[in-house]
Amino acid sequence: LAERDRINKRFQNPKFKRFVSVTQLMIFSNNMEYDDTDVQAIQGAFYASPSYLEPQFNYFREEEVLNWTALLKPLSEDTELHVLKDNNLEVIRSNPEFITNKEPNRPTNLICTSLLSRERLAFVLRYALAYVHETDGLQKHVMRYPQLFASKAIERKLNDGIKKGIIWHTQGSGKTALAYYNVRFLTDYFQQRQIVPKFYFIVDRIDLLTQAHREFTSRGLTVHTIDSRDAFSRDIKATQVIHNHSGKPEITVVNIQKFKDDPDVVSTKDYDVTIQRVYFLDEVHRSYNPKGSFLANLDQSDRNAVKIGLTGTPLLGDDYNSRTLFGDYIHKYYYNASIADGYTLRLIREEIATNYKIALQQALAEAEVLQGDVDRKLVYAHPAFVEPMLDYIVTDFEKSRGALNDASIGGMVICDSAEQARQLFELFNAKYAKSPVSTESAANEPDFPLLKQAAETSGFYRVKRKQNNQVTSAALILHDVGCKEERKDWVEDFKVGKLDFLFVYNSCSPASMPNA
């Protein structure tokens, strides 16, 4: 932690800017094993790309069996003694801890061997670094270790003559970024074989096309988008690999939502076979019909194409099996691993407070009496039930902000129905929107968590902190509320912290709730 704080202060100092700019890769280690229960990266060996703000520490878990005999050069006693003398540490030479820490399987030695061996370091410097245009400026990103090993796995499959398969990486693990890195990597891979590649990223929803376009352009790729059958048919038959005149790397993002089951959208005739087409197929867990779907016809049209399916939840049933349609798994990265690496937050189901549970039960009974024997969705959307539920949500959320000392946390309320979402939003605007509590009531709040520091026990600070944690803004996301651009803007405002709450209705199953 001390070293991390030190590097953060240095990199935020304008005088260190030149050193930050020339730094490509950093490794931090306290030579301890990872503690997967830690919320923050506190112990272990981590790698990061430089940042003018705070470097993002990444875990590294070696997946390949390394030949230490070939990679590591034996250390002579003279060299060891010279280093110890130079640091005035000869006394530790016979120390058991020093002897143990020389072993190649210690955390620091492991990450150094994994990342700094000649071949790996060359790969990282050439393909694993990217400048990303974020909302807060230009950031330098480094490839996550599952993306690195997935890229190497793709290379092995291609070397073995296998041209299709599935990458099973959990939701939120950076599958679009993986596709970006492999545009660069596979371009060089095929050019070494005198082959010109042409890259496609195929999605089946317009919002996914927009998201992919944003992800690719922010990383510097030129993006060509296709959203119609005729445009895709023309593009796939064209001999032109890129559409820009500067020679920059390019990818074509295709939304097949309107024509994915059209058997004639891709035709074998007039097909240029001199181009190596590489398809990244997003969300291949969806139920594509293997007999009449777009993807089946795509397979028939270009047998030589490379098809890489991306999914976080593959289909394993008898009717639709992802492996049957798209090939065997190229690489896997599961939900639990992503949680341990800090890329995915752990889902926690908590019981609601007893007093509110009783209040909600009473409100539900009252709503049932008022509504009579009707659809339960109408009961759950009745103000008699919705209002106490909203009170509990807001109160519990504001307490969580205080307990976590983070007023930037946002909340998404996934409602039982569109009617319930509308009612919640209407009541929120009536009771909470832009209505900060008075100074006196906030200072006297009995269950408001107090900080331990003496300097922070004044009534003014408590009032200020209480007001910062207040929920005062929200948006309603429904298909018939606002236009597409407005809904998109509301979601973006929520992501950057301009909105506290989103009230949404998403008819998803419990299993797909994390994707909502």
Model segments located where?
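SF2 helicase catalytic motif II
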Residues: 270-306
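Conserved C-terminal RecA-like helicase domain
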Residues: 247-250, 377-504
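Short basic/glycine-enriched coil/helix segment immediately N-terminal to the Walker B
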Residues: 159-163, 191-192, 245-248, 263-278, ...
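Structural recognition of the conserved hydrophobic beta-strand(s) that form the central parallel beta-sheet
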Residues: 28-29, 252-255, 280, 306-311, ...
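Inter-Walker segment of RecA-like/P-loop motor cores
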Residues: 217-264
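Interdomain helical connector at the RecA1-RecA2 junction of SF1/SF2 helicase-like NTPases
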Residues: 101, 320-408, 424-426, 430
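ATP-dependent helicase/translocase motor core
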Residues: 1-198, 207, 211-222, 247, ...
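Conserved helicase ATPase motor motifs in RecA-like P-loop NTPase domains
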Residues: 170-171, 283-287, 301-318, 342
